[in-house]
Every structure is written in structure tokens, then in C-alpha cells.
Regions:
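Basic nucleic-acid-binding alpha-helical/helix-turn surface characteristic of O6-alkylguanine DNA
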Residues: 1-102, 148-162, 169-188
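Structural motif
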Residues: 15-16, 116, 125
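Residue-level "edge-of-site" marker
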Residues: 94, 109, 125
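Regulatory, non-catalytic segments
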Residues: 103-121
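Charged low-complexity interaction tracts in eukaryotic proteins
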Residues: 121-167
Length: 188
């Protein structure tokens, strides 16, 4: 299963800077620190953790517990992802509008793809518009007809092979798993 891989969490002075499955993110962060940071960090760690530990961590982490490296625009997009919470999925175009950049859907999508802390910053909850349209169609059909025993739960919708939830840095299957976890978990 996609969740069985070794996950690496990079921390700088105790703050989460990246989550990945390879040490490339650590190298990227080291290059960024070397070229742009005036103050040297006291401690940089890269620790392997399990998927379950990441899921537990994301329930307790606060925005100030993270240290993000990116452009001002990228940080704005990542903050908006964080603020949107984990209770809904949005299309890229709807999310770009939420970011007050409706005309810049591609730029917003690119920033989403560069999210250094996926899973915790829920970039997986932004999906192609076609997926949203199909989900709405299923929900409308269910409301306008007699319920015929079809399971319209989140799990059933996520398992519908006709719905493409889009690309994800760790694969499509894990994206669906994360959507399922987030949408079926009660939020505080």
C-alpha cells in the first residue's frame, strides 16, 4: 500500500519544513538555507516516520509549527490551503478564486504542486473541476430519484472509477486515501 513507504519529516529548529519519501527535499532546503538565509539554523533533522504518525501529527500541528520556503505567492496559496480546512474538496478554479486569483488557475495549481508539506497542508483536497462536476451530478441524481440502495458515501464516490481526482506528488491512490481520511474525520 502507498502508506507503507518510509516517510521523511524534515525539521528546522523544531519546525516542520518538509515531508517526503526521499531526501531530495532535505537537499532543496539545505540549498535554500545556504543561499538565502542570513541566520544559520541551530538544528536540521530528517527523521523517518510512519504514515500513521503523519496522520496523528496533522491533527495537532498548528500553522506556526511549520517553516515554509517559497515565494510570497506560494506561501499565500499554502496558507489558503491550510485555512480551508479538511472538510471539503474544491476544484482548482474554485480554489484559485478563493485565493483571489481566478485568472491565475495555473499559477495557483503550480504552487499547490510545490507544497513542501503535503498531507499536513491539504493540497490533496484540490481536484479537477470535472471530478467536482461528477460528484455534484451523482448527488443531484440521488436527490431527484428514489434512493435505490446505491451507496453515496464518500467512500463509494472515491471508489467510482469514472471520477478522476487528479495527480498527486505521492500518486493518485494515496490522494484518494487522504481525501477519504480527511472528509470522514470529524474536524475540531
Amino acid at each position: 500500500m502507498d502508506t507503507d513507504r518510509k516517510w521523511i519529516i524534515v525539521r528546522i529548529d523544531g519546525k516542520i519544513a518538509a515531508i517526503s519519501t526521499d531526501y531530495g527535499k532535505l537537499a532543496d532546503i539545505a540549498r535554500h538555507i545556504a543561499s538565502k538565509t542570513k541566520e544559520s539554523p541551530q538544528e536540521i533533522t530528517a527523521t523517518t516516520i510512519s504514515f500513521d504518525e503523519i496522520i496523528k501529527l496533522k491533527q495537532n500541528v498548528q500553522w506556526d509549527d511549520m517553516l515554509l520556503f517559497g515565494t510570497t505567492f506560494q506561501k499565500k496559496v499554502w496558507k489558503m490551503l491550510w485555512d480551508m480546512g479538511r472538510s471539503r474538496i474544491l476544484s482548482y478554479s474554485d480554489f484559485a478564486e478563493l485565493c483571489e486569483n481566478k485568472a491565475g488557475v495555473r499559477a495557483v495549481a503550480h504552487a499547490i504542486g510545490l507544497n513542501p508539506i503535503p498531507i499536513i497542508i491539504p493540497c490533496h483536497l484540490v481536484v479537477p473541476k470535472e471530478a467536482i462536476d461528477k460528484i455534484r451530478g451523482i448527488q443531484t441524481k440521488a436527490q431527484s430519484t428514489i434512493f435505490k440502495g446505491q451507496d453515496l458515501s464518500i467512500k463509494a464516490i472515491l471508489e467510482d472509477p469514472s471520477i478522476d481526482f487528479g495527480e498527486y506528488v505521492f500518486g493518485r491512490k494515496l490522494k484518494k486515501t487522504l481525501i477519504s481520511i480527511d472528509l470522514s474525520t470529524e474536524q475540531p
